[in-house]
Amino acid sequence: MDSHFVYIVKCSDGSLYTGYAKDVNARVEKHNRGQGAKYTKVRRPVHLVYQEMYETKSEALKREYEIKTYTRQKKLRLIKER
């Protein structure tokens, strides 16, 4: 069974980026090579600060969308609670 992840990275400017990946470590490396999202491309390096694992892509994408609606403060609380 495949694993699906929602992750948050902290960018060099202190901002937070939320994304989805099947392989979080490879995705973070991709962000740091400038091959990830446009948002992170100009905010490198990024550091993984949070991740959640799901059994299905659908669950992970729903959670990614939910987290993307959070305020910065709510994301920081989520990171701190883990």
From Swiss-Prot:
Domain of life: Bacteria
One protein family per Pfam: GIY-YIG
CDD domains: GIY-YIG_UPF0213
InterPro entries recorded: GIY-YIG_endonuc, GIY-YIG_endonuc_sf, UPF0213_domain
Residue ranges annotated for the GIY-YIG domain, each copy included: 2-77
Family: Belongs to the UPF0213 family.
Protein name: UPF0213 protein SAOUHSC_00458
Lineage: Bacteria, Bacillati, Bacillota, Bacilli, Bacillales
